[in-house]
């Protein structure tokens, strides 16, 4: 009787360390839980794979934060062996590295602390997040949320169906919004901010010059430092004005001289 009790305790201890339930499951390291069919855990500790065809594995590459604004990716890449606390739930998902989470169908969280949730969602780099069908976050600290949303710039954010934030620190919010300039921001369905620190606010608003700003539906700012303010407004090249007529009265002798560098407000 004493020997039987000892055997039960030993069996329970083994089960607590590695749990495998289902057909063709493959737990490898300590404290992993693998359930259902054809799930694979390779070289990972404290891993969880639940569903069918999921893979939890170690990662030999990750990225650190940048020390300065335009530090190249090659300088921030680190090599090593990261392999604990990752989770894959659903069908054919992959979670790699440390504390990665992949949920849905064919989603991939490929580096430390990355999150991919949805059908074919991909979080490709460290601290990236992709949520939604075919959403993709492909840079460090990038976030893509929505159907086919894409965040491919460092610390970029794309939120909305087919929204795209493709440069460093860019933000695109709204269906088909596009922020492709460095530090660009596009808010609204179809809004576009394509140049350095350009800003577009409103449906189909467009800012296509450096430091340009478009505010209002279909507003269009196309000149350096210019502002298009109001629905359908556009900008023009800044020019020198020596006089102006107000309420029938002409005023002249202006000292200020306009220039393209100073921009215009329309």
Predicted regions and their residues:
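Bacterial Sec-dependent N-terminal signal peptides
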Residues: 1-29
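Periodic small-residue-enriched repeat registers in elongated scaffold domains
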Residues: 27-266
């Amino acid at each position: 009787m004493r020997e039987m009790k000892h055997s039960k305790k030993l069996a329970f201890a083994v089960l607590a360390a590695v749990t495998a339930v289902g057909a063709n499951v493959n737990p490898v390291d300590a404290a992993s839980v693998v359930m259902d069919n054809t799930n694979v855990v390779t070289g990972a500790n404290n891993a969880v794979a639940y569903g069918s065809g999921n893979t939890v594995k170690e990662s030999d590459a990750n990225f650190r934060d940048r020390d300065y604004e335009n530090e190249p990716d090659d300088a921030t890449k680190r090599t090593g062996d990261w392999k604990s606390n990752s989770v894959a739930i659903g069908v054919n998902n992959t979670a790699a590295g440390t504390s990665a989470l992949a949920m849905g169908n064919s989603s991939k969280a490929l580096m430390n602390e990355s999150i991919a949730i949805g059908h074919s969602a991909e979080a490709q780099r460290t601290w990236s997040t992709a949520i939604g069908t075919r959403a993709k976050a492909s840079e460090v600290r990038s976030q893509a949320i929505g159907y086919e949303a894409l965040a491919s710039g460092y610390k970029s954010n794309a939120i909305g169906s087919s929204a795209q934030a493709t440069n460093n620190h860019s933000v695109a919010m709204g269906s088909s919004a596009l922020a492709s300039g460095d530090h660009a921001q596009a808010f609204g369905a179809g809004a576009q901010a394509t140049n350095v620190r350009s800003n577009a606010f409103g449906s189909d608003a467009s800012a296509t010059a450096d430091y340009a700003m478009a505010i209002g539906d279909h507003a269009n700012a196309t000149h350096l430092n210019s502002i298009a303010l109001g629905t359908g407004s556009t900008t023009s090249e800044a020019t020198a004005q020596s006089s102006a007529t107000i309420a029938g009265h002409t005023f002249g002798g202006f000292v200020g001289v306009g220039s393209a560098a100073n921009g215009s407000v329309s």
